[in-house]
Amino acid sequence: MRHIGAIVLGLLLGACGGAGSVSAPSVTPQPSAPASAAVVATPAPTYSPKAEGFTSKVLVEKPREVATSAAGFAWIAAGTSTVGKGVTATVSEKESFTASYETPIDRQAADAKQAIYLTPDLPPLAAGRYTESLRLVVVQAGGRSSAHMHSGIEGVLVLEGQVLVRSGGNAPASLVTGQGFFILPKVPVQLINVGSGVARTLVYSISPEGAPFSTELTESP
């Protein structure tokens, strides 16, 4: 928070000369009251942890084996995979996408190079069986998701509109069409539509097999 110090204004008053031999009394300048400007903090908007005007649809879901525990990254690309990796889904007549989770060495692969959104390198997933999925999320104007957290990693691409992402331990982020974000396991998150129209996001997730996709929370992040 910036603080604006008081600005002190000084006024200089001059003495006036009188008629004949009678001199006018001198006037002692009186300092004016200090003028100050105060900056008042605007409280951040608060949101109910309950969902409103929100729908989520599973487009595709399939098992995935992670053979070794290593750092990785998620990517989302338009169209289908050139090498058959990841999960692919059609969102609309003009929109289809593929997404996957790979190790950093795969950043040079054709799919990753053509990606619309790539996450940075993420903490390692434990070796084991997982479920990969793509979901289409639609949030009406003024709507929001519930406050929740995930059992796995999410990579999210904004397909339409403007959204505000609030997550535990991070500053709120406003994103528009074509931008993306990621969420690590067990991090509280809430998605709010701050645009004037409908917002759509494509959600790629890789979650431990058998674990709940998400868990609702009673408090907003």
Predicted regions and their residues:
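Ligand-binding loop in jelly-roll beta-barrel domains
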Residues: 86-110, 185-212
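C-terminal motif of bacterial Sec signal peptides marking the signal peptidase cleavage site
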Residues: 12-15
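A short glycine-rich, His/Asp/Glu-containing loop-to-beta-strand
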Residues: 39-74, 111-144, 204
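Short acidic-glycine-tyrosine-enriched beta hairpin
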Residues: 59-99, 139, 167-186
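Bacterial signal peptide processing site
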Residues: 17-20
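Ser/Thr-rich, Proline-interspersed low-complexity disordered segments
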Residues: 22-48, 215-221
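His-enriched metal-coordination microenvironments in redox/metal-binding proteins
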Residues: 148-152, 157
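Sec-dependent signal peptide recognition
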Residues: 2-9
